[in-house]
A protein has these predicted regions:
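Active-site rim elements
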Residues: 106-115, 208-215, 275-282, 355-360, ...
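N-terminal secretory signal peptides and thylakoid transit peptides that target proteins
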Residues: 1-14
């Protein structure tokens, strides 16, 4: 899809202030990633620094989950750790806003209860007080105030809302039979063990089976797998498509069958308290986890810092070149070690000597829209509201977990542009004006909320050009679950692009792993691994 075609598609309806003639124009703005400045790295337009360098023990490039997790892991060592971040916010796609009736997510909005094997995630949750203790079987006990309250989910299907994501009473016999068949398979797959004695799917991914029969699923798409297994139910196909878009930002034909089935069978933790919900939820979404990492990282964060390149130099140092975007002044920092917490395509440009070893990933653009509401739009709200067969993924209610009563809230809408032409979609979104994107959101939600335009006072939108890696067929590579970490003795890489799946546990583990990998070059002992 080229840019002109994209804009024509997005603007296919009316402009926002003409949906309901005579109404005051809807307020709003586009916020988020600094696409134009960031492209200086791609285009080689940044000047070369000439002044004296400053010094640090460790420089971390990027303040997303991976970068902050690396700083968190290094904190006990008492080092001078500098984090260089382009944006004015922390957390990358896990960031949040607090300019409404409640804090609200600008990206990732929940954490599924981690498996016991996700030791780093559980360590952080225990430090936060979310994990309250451990049962006799070594399973974590969670603060019930953080587990998603009921009603958790609802779906708008055939003109009405229904509890949960599967409206059992409304499905025809064929749809119901195939959903039941798939559910049984999902349960069996969750418990299945490979020939090497490991679960076929596990989180963290490194604990998954290397069984060749299971790994063969990575050679086909999820759509091809559905065809092969004879699943023809329209609702089942929609259900799987929704899962692929929600977790990977891609259509089933663009997703490895291994990755898609991992989505359904990778969560193992079962306790009585999780019978109602497996989701850990905060008003600001995973922004709560970003705050927790930042508070514990003991690092100095420089915002508005565009890293343009790095090289190893004499004296056991790494030179990091960066641009202060506030005054466009080129600067450099000499560090004893560097963690590059950036996507593979960025890391490839920053450290060309490692380019050939980095995986090739594609990513989908996303739109996230935060709609500010002064009065309830629906008397039976759930935390997550999904519209069947809509373009977007629905919306979540930021106030769902809050106990104090208030009519005001913020509803966060998500849409992934998951087709094969991510480049065209990305280019179109980056130049699309706010009015067109906001109009698209309202039109998508109109079947369930025809009066939504009257019920919201403001809609801010964020365009994530490279939101998350898409685990396409073959993404596991020739050496599955053995991520590239050290690019050089003193340069480590940490990002969700390593495993190719944007799970919190994987991003966090990549940061912890990178920090532990550069410890020898720093001459420090971090003790036992946190992984």
């Amino acid at each position: 899809m080229d840019r002109r075609a994209f804009l024509t598609t997005v603007a296919a309806g009316w402009m926002v202030d003409t949906i309901l003639p005579g109404k005051a124009p809807l307020a709003g703005r586009i916020i988020g990633a600094s696409h134009g400045v960031g492209h200086l790295v791609r285009d080689g337009g940044a000047p070369t620094p000439s002044g004296p360098p400053d010094r640090a023990d460790v420089v971390i490039v990027g303040a997303g989950i991976a970068g902050l997790s690396a700083a968190w892991r290094l904190a006990p060592a008492g080092l001078d750790v500098r984090v260089l971040e382009l944006e004015q916010f922390l957390g990358g796609t896990s960031t949040w806003g607090d300019d409404g009736a409640a804090p609200h997510p600008w990206g990732a909005h929940y954490l599924a209860a981690p498996n016991p094997e996700a030791r780093a995630a559980l360590r952080l949750l225990e430090q936060m007080g979310v994990v309250k203790g451990w049962d006799a079987a070594g399973r974590p006990r969670f603060d019930p105030r953080v587990l998603c309250h009921a009603p958790q989910e609802r779906i708008f299907y055939r003109g009405a809302w229904h509890p949960g994501l599967v409206p059992q009473d409304e499905l025809d016999a064929h749809d119901r039979a195939e959903m039941e068949r798939f559910s049984r398979f999902e349960d069996e797959l969750t418990e299945r063990v490979g020939a090497d004695g490991k679960p076929v799917f596990q989180i963290p991914l490194a604990f998954s089976s290397r069984d060749p029969d299971t790994l063969a699923l990575d050679r086909i798409s999820m759509r091809a797998w559905l065809d092969r297994e004879g699943y023809t139910s329209p609702f089942l196909r929609w259900y799987v498509r929704y899962a692929c878009l929600d977790d990977f930002g891609a259509e089933p034909e663009e997703v490895s069958a291994w990755a898609a089935l991992h989505y359904f069978a990778g969560r193992k933790l079962k306790t009585p308290e999780l019978d109602g919900s497996h989701f850990l939820v905060w008003p600001e979404g995973n922004g709560k986890l970003v705050q927790a990492l930042s508070e514990r990282a003991r690092a100095t964060v420089t915002h508005g810092a565009l890293v343009t390149g790095l090289d190893t130099i004499e004296g056991g140092r790494v030179e990091v070149r960066w641009l202060d975007v506030r005054d466009r002044a080129p600067r450099r920092t000499h560090a004893r070690a560097v963690v590059v917490a950036a996507p593979a395509f960025v890391t490839r440009r920053l450290f060309p000597s490692a380019a050939a070893r980095l995986p090739t990933r594609t990513s989908s653009p996303w739109v996230v829209a935060n709609m500010h509401v002064e009065r309830p739009i629906d008397p039976d709200m759930a935390w997550d509201s999904v519209l069947y067969d809509a373009a977007g993924l629905g919306y979540v209610d930021a106030r769902h977990q809050l106990t104090e009563l208030s009519a005001r809230t913020v509803l966060t809408y998500y849409r992934a542009y998951g087709g094969p032409d991510v480049v065209g979609a990305r280019k179109g979104l980056v130049v699309a004006p706010w009015e067109q994107i906001a109009n698209d959101v309202l039109l998508d939600l109109a079947p369930a909320h025809p009066e939504l335009r009257e019920q919201i006072t403001r809609m801010d939108v964020c365009v994530w050009g490279h939101a998350m890696p898409r685990p396409r067929p073959g993404f596991l590579g020739e050496q599955p679950f053995e991520p590239l970490v050290l690019l050089d003795e003193r340069v480590a890489w940490a990002h969700a692009d390593q495993p190719g799946m944007a799970l919190f546990e994987e991003s966090q583990a990549s940061g912890v792993r990178a920090a532990e990998a550069v410890a020898p070059a720093l001459g420090i002992a971090l003790g036992s691994t946190w992984l």
